[in-house]
Amino acid sequence: MFSLLTAAIAPAMALLCFFYLKNEYGSQTLGFVVRTFLIGALLMFPVMVLQHAFLAEGFFANPLLKAFILYGFFEEFFKWFMLYFFAYKHVEFNRRYDGIIFGVSLSLGFASMENGLYLIANGVETALGRALLPVSSHAIYGVIMGYYLGRAKMEEKHRKKWLVLSLFLPVLLHSLYDAILLLWSKHFLFVMVPFMLVLWWVAIQKVKLANQLDR
């Protein structure tokens, strides 16, 4: 059980530390970061129940509908909703990079709980693949969501545009990720590897830009 718990949480902790330490202009209190992580972990349960309910009723049988609505939209919308109401309006959210920290923290909380349940069902031997793909992809969605929420918080003139992008882009990227898995199930790595490399490049650029704008 200890090894399974470690395998479920360790990738998220490593990624969270990576992005936390990338903050060049101050750091957030760990207490609030942990709080957003736990909110993300708890959020996974109602989202999972909702997804299973729709699947049980025969909705979203089409792979593209499943990828874009059931997985991409549902998961990213609820993460965005919780991030907006629990972190965006908080006094500690006072830099653009804070959005990245909180977005990554909440997303990795969600991914850790999802990862733990998957490992319980499928065995700890699947942990490496889970760390490299689903967990890291959730971190990247959190970076992008948080980056644009940070822009919205600090740049009132274009707030609506940044808020829309903070939801739309993570939904789009998450949906494309799941579409690759569903449509290219046997040979998905040929598409997924370049896709993930592009996602990581985008995430690192957002990290650099957020730090530059916070100067």
Curated annotation (Swiss-Prot):
Q: Which UniProt keywords apply?
A: Cell membrane, Hydrolase, Membrane, Protease, Transmembrane, Transmembrane helix
A biological process (GO) annotation for this entry?
Answer: proteolysis
Give the CC-aspect GO terms.
Answer: plasma membrane
Membrane-spanning intervals of the chain: 1-23, 31-53, 100-121, 130-151, 180-203
Provide the protein's localization: Cell membrane
Residue intervals annotated with topology Cytoplasmic: 24-30, 122-129, 204-215
List the ranges whose topology is Extracellular. Answer: 54-99, 152-179
Give any GO molecular function from the UniProt entry.
Answer: peptidase activity
Q: Which Pfam families match?
A: PrsW-protease
Q: What is its main location?
A: membrane
Q: What is its EC number?
A: 3.4.-.-
Provide the membrane topology annotation.
Answer: Multi-pass membrane protein
**NCBIfam families on file:** intramemb_PrsW
Q: What does this protein do?
A: Involved in the degradation of specific anti-sigma factors. Responsible for Site-1 cleavage of the RsiW anti-sigma factor. This results, after two other proteolytic steps catalyzed by the RasP and ClpXP proteases, in the release of SigW and the transcription activation of the genes under the control of the sigma-W factor.
Spell out the family assignment given in the record's similarity comment. Belongs to the protease PrsW family.
Q: What is this protein called?
A: Protease PrsW
Species: Halalkalibacterium halodurans (strain ATCC BAA-125 / DSM 18197 / FERM 7344 / JCM 9153 / C-125)
Name of the gene:
prsW
